[in-house]
Regions:
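DNA major-groove recognition helix of helix-turn-helix/homeodomain DNA-binding modules
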Residues: 43-60
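Structural motif corresponding to the intra-repeat A-B loop/turn of tetratricopeptide repeats
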Residues: 79, 110-113, 161, 201, ...
Length: 373
């Protein structure tokens, strides 16, 4: 289907105009019907007149502007330079190009949610691949457009779903393809998620191997956010594997810790006998905002640590168990699997203390098949 035919139809219907009213003096009703349904390719003059009657701007200068913006946007997206892409699209008013076919490119490049399905017949393969990613159909996007970007998106989706073996395969493919294309940002992102996947499997040697490469890339790109993420995830893995003093050294050394970093610091202090420092970290965290996860859920996680610190007999208290299990269910249902995996030891501890051994086994078998036993 022709995009401009579609937009003429949509705008005419929105205004509640008849076909006869729109095309009067321009073309016949039957010809307009064919244009709207994509069965006819009208001349530039007829298109211009129909669009002008609908107050939709189009001329060669507008088309050139839109094409240049879209070309630059695709280059930035497919090489992982999302910050620059956001800046590029903020500078231009894409609605100005609504009557130009390239509007589809600009809309997809700036979209956070899928475009309406009725537009899909107007899309080319590249546009449709991005539409599928927005629809969370990443495997279909890879089939349509197998490149570093789509493999990265598939790997991230598999990672978030807890399918770590599949994630590793897709992310490694993304890294290799990005290396061939010189897409350094995609290489970095692939390495970060590869490290994350091995982190959640508590495979520290492979985690450190991927993070080591990721750290080099982040240093070369001067990406402080990526460096902090590597440090945070590595130290979190140390907590999961009982290396509390090493984790404490990292979390206590952060000059501007986030709420979740203070949560981890409090756990390190809890595990190493630094009770007062743990309580101070929790108090500080409770006053902070957070973008990473829902703040109410984050406060519940802080409350769990505080409860253990203030009630040494927490394993005998039903209200602790209720808070723990409810929070754990929210982590499983609302966030990437790594959050639940991190808190799994406390759930297993609770089940063991309350002699619910069957539930402990079922939890591991049903929800965490890749968790080392």
């Amino acid at each position: 289907m022709n995009y401009q035919g579609y937009i003429i139809y949509r705008e005419r219907v929105r205004r509640n105009w008849s076909q006869a009213g729109l095309c009067k003096g321009i073309c016949t009703v039957s010809y307009l019907s064919k244009i709207e349904s994509g069965r006819a390719e009208p001349s530039e003059e007829i298109l211009r007149l129909l669009l002008a009657r609908l107050n939709l701007e189009t001329n060669r200068e507008v088309e050139r502007e839109a094409a240049g913006l879209a070309e630059r946007g695709w280059e930035l997206l497919l090489t992982g330079r999302r910050g620059q892409l956001r800046g590029l699209l903020r500078e231009g008013d894409i609605e100005r190009y609504r009557a130009v076919p390239t509007w589809l490119d600009l809309a997809l490049l700036s979209a956070q949610t899928p475009l309406e399905p009725a537009l899909e017949p107007c899309m080319d393969v590249r546009q449709l691949a991005v539409q599928r990613i927005l629809q969370r159909q990443e495997a279909e996007a890879v089939r349509l457009m197998p490149n570093a970007y789509t493999h990265l998106m598939l790997g991230i989706a598999d990672y978030n779903a807890g399918s770590y073996s599949a994630a590793v395969d897709a992310l490694q493919t993304a890294y290799d393809l990005a290396g061939r294309e010189g897409a350094v940002r995609l290489m970095l992102e692939a390495k970060l998620f590869l490290g994350n996947a091995y982190c959640n499997r508590q495979d520290l040697p492979n985690m450190e191997r991927h993070y080591r490469v990721g750290r080099r890339l982040a240093e070369d790109l001067q990406d402080e956010s990526a460096l902090r993420a590597i440090g945070y995830n590595t130290a979190s893995a140390w907590i999961e594997t009982g290396r509390y003093e090493e984790a404490y050294a990292w979390f206590s050394g952060q000059e501007q810790p986030t709420l979740m970093a203070l949560h981890k610091l409090a756990i390190c202090c809890e595990k190493t006998g630094r009770r007062e420092e743990a309580l101070r970290a929790l108090t500080r965290a409770e006053a902070m905002d957070i973008d990473e996860i829902d703040r109410a859920l984050a406060l519940r996680l802080l409350q769990l640590v505080r409860y253990r610190l203030e009630h040494p007999d927490y394993l005998t208290r039903d209200d602790y168990g209720a808070l723990l299990l409810d929070s754990f269910d929210r982590l499983r249902n609302e966030l990437p699997l790594g959050y639940a995996l991190f808190h799994l030891p406390w759930v297993l501890e609770w089940y063991k203390a309350t002699r619910q051994y069957k539930k402990a086994c079922e939890l591991l078998e049903a929800y965490f098949p890749e968790k080392p036993l």
